[in-house]
Swiss-Prot record:
One of its GO terms (biological process) is translation. It comes from Xylella fastidiosa (strain 9a5c). Pfam families: Ribosomal_L27. This is Large ribosomal subunit protein bL27. One of its GO terms (cellular component) is cytosolic large ribosomal subunit. Signal peptide: none annotated. PROSITE patterns: RIBOSOMAL_L27. Keywords: Ribonucleoprotein, Ribosomal protein.
Amino acid sequence: MAHKKGVGSSRNGRDSNPKYLGVKLFGGQAIEAGNIIIRQRGTQFHAGDGVGLGRDHTLFALVDGTVAFSIKGPKKRRTVNVIPA
């Protein structure tokens, strides 16, 4: 028999940091060039006119203007545009 009590160890107790994904500016809001519109994993929203796509699929404004969302094409893709001011 063991002379010491076996101490169990839990394999839980880890959690990843929050990623703060989602829409940062909504339709009709004013935006400046370089501002982030959406942080996302994959292309849930696609870049339209005046919008750039970052390495991590972040959508950002290329020009100053107003944010506009639309659904285009047969695949019903959600696109984000920036209408120049």
